[in-house]
Amino acid sequence: MIIAVDGMGGDFAPELVVEGCIQAVKEYEGIHIIITGKKELIKNELDKREYKGNKIEILNAEEVISTNEAPVKAIRRKKDSSMVKALELVKEGKAQAVISAGSTGALMAGATFVLGRIKGINRVCLAPLLPGAKAPFMIVDAGANVDCKAEYLVQFAMMGKVYFESVLGVKSPTVGLVNIGAEEEKGNELTKAAYKLLKDTDFNFIGNIEPRDIPRGEVNIAVCDGFIGNTVLKTYEGVASNLFSMLKDEMMASTRGKIGGALLKPVFKDFKKKFDYTEYGGSPFLGAKGICIKAHGSSDAKAFKNAIRQAKICYDKKIIEEIENNLGNLIENNI
């Protein structure tokens, strides 16, 4: 399997991108990586780490897409950018997956306009996997589509279901529709229409769920439009981050707190690890005609290594084909 990695995307590119790639080719068999970006910079990082293998190569790209550029314009105009070059490798069949920690909007545009959508899929969605109290959960969509139709949400749910079943090995994952109340009649026109459609599928649909229920692990797949999904995601990340800071401040404020903190250090360490995004790799763009993983902007080497592992599993489990097959089932049932 060949994986294209955007070598210039993210806060710590290309240093930690290269480090993550080296770790990945050492740990996972059957992968070859093409790092796109400024050749001299990437080669210097490989040389620093004394990498002498033949499982990593460089494809030169002189341009970089920044996070403050208009996503669609950047993808269309910067043909010599590291992100576009990586996407084109997948489009041309020279790689089977693409990974980038660069601009989310630009990668979304690239997944749609460079890779294209799977035939019959209306919209590509961003599907982050997040730690929950009982088990990880996925939000679909987490920001790619702020305006949606009910049928889009059904497709998002289907693709999330495929990911859980194929990649994570979870049989019959639960699907919940994010809403302001659990009752069927709650919500706006979109959620009411989506509820009716989801109820008629063969998904393990548990009905409406409120945002507070999501991190409790009440559902595997939380379905919503991108506006709601991104709000839920950012709130969740903010609360988790501030919770750790508040606990640390409280413990350091008194002698009793310091003693208690020392005694509970192993517990806090395990708890923090549970919320470590690097364990999950990245967020797939589901519905694209190619495996496309968005790594977190602040990804370290471990996160990149795990994103590469994630891409490999998606490829091995034939996730694109599985989405196509499941889409066919929806169409057969007129949903």
From Swiss-Prot:
GO cellular component: cytoplasm
Reactions catalysed: a fatty acyl-[ACP] + phosphate = an acyl phosphate + holo-[ACP]
Places the protein is found: Cytoplasm
Predominant localisation class: cytoplasm
Keyword Protein transport: no
Associated pathway: Lipid metabolism; phospholipid metabolism
Superkingdom of source: Bacteria
Cystine pairs: none
EC class name: transferase
Subunit field text: Homodimer. Probably interacts with PlsY.
Protein name as catalogued: Phosphate acyltransferase
